[in-house]
Amino acid sequence: MYKQVKRINDIGRYIYIDGLIYGIKEEEGKRYFQELSLGGEVLWQSKESNVYDYYANEEVIIFNLKTTEGIFDVLIYDRKTKKIIFKGEIELYLFSPRFYDKNILYNINKNRVLTFDILKGGILQEKEISLKGITAFFTYDYIVRYDDIYIYIYVKNDFSLLWQQNIQDFFPGEEELSIFEIYSYKDTFIIIARVGIVCLSQKDGHLLWRLNKGAFTMEIVGNLGYVCTGLSLYWVNLDNGEKYGYGRKYDRLPDFEYNGETYWPAGYRVVYHKGLLWYRVYSSGESFILVIDPETANYQWIHKVETYEKVMDIKFYDDKMFVTDTGYNLFIYEEE
């Protein structure tokens, strides 16, 4: 399957673009933005040593600086030439990819919406308006936002509220309901709400189907959604809401053995890659990656990650697998 070829420590949140790694290096109370090779070599480092939030895409690097007065100065560099495109004093929140719709940054707080062009370094629109919830993602027409039990759909061009829906209406009496994730599928929204899943029309929010089955996360592959709930795995036909399992009680994944020890398959997310489901597990103080056959839910590969921390994320780039843990370490694997 894969073998580990590099470990980069203390990198925190990273961004991968064109075979390069971008992130923060903390050193003696200073924070630099760096561009690294896959071998961990520093190819470029910011002159600024007080970098706070940051983001990068194929064209630009953008970060802001933390000063005693606050977080204001924003710098935008051409990612390839490292020439400064923009430098200005403006308060922007940069840290989450959820804030970006291609090259447009949306800063939405309680009473204001500001849109900013990160390629040119200019404010496109600033409007005094209050939007409910937090941003999940953008579609071509909509801003999708949510809070604990509500989903809010705003029209992107004027920030008007198109519709909102209390998900509790579909699960009356379920006190543990909470929106965990929202996905866009065709012309619908799939909402993972802990105690169940609902599919709503993007146009007006009417209910298309509902599944009364616990759900934490979903990985969408074609018209199928692979759902995890902590120890179990099942899949759903997203066109009609029909649920399928693997013939096991409560859809529970089987325990697994490693070096003569038995472990619970305690995880909450699968990632689809090359026809298989990659499942991160933290059990008895150990972190593992289990590779699951989606047809049978049988294990195809069991790998122990060399860390005492919890594995947080698995991503695939070209022939590489990137794994991060709660200790801000990045493990790089190559396909064998």
Question: Where would I find each of the regions flagged by the language model?
Answer:
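N-terminal "mature head" segments of proteins
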Residues: 1-90, 117, 125-127, 327-330
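Blade-level signature of beta-propeller repeat domains, shared across WD40, Kelch, NHL, RCC1
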Residues: 306-336
